């Protein structure tokens, strides 16, 4: 946040929050921001309609609006523009359903894109992977970090997930240690 010139507002979550705990904490945080005069929240969602609707519904319930500047942009075009502009991003989490451990901790570049299986969105828009952007044209300075451990974590799947043959989700997380 400092490198981008924004204040950092933290929302502390319990180690493994329930959706209800998450909703309550998010509502409290957003209401606090609203009391400071903030009326909109910006999201990087691209094409998941249900997620966009969820975010809009949650914001509308407290009188705020969501802004989705990347909505419906072709992800192949978006990642090319992102890289061409000079943004630097590292993969911090991969969903083992789509990608193996070797993708955690990789920098997103042309080689990364070429190595992605065909069923994986290049922006990870279906939850295949998550990232941290540490440098680019909007940054005053790069965020300096070292790569820490790559850790496997499992989470139970909801009983409603009938399409799944496994009982749990498996994710690989790459710890980043800020210098």
Kindly label every feature range from the protein language model.
Residues 2-179:
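Nucleotide-activated chemistry modules centered on ATP-dependent adenylation/adenylyltransferase
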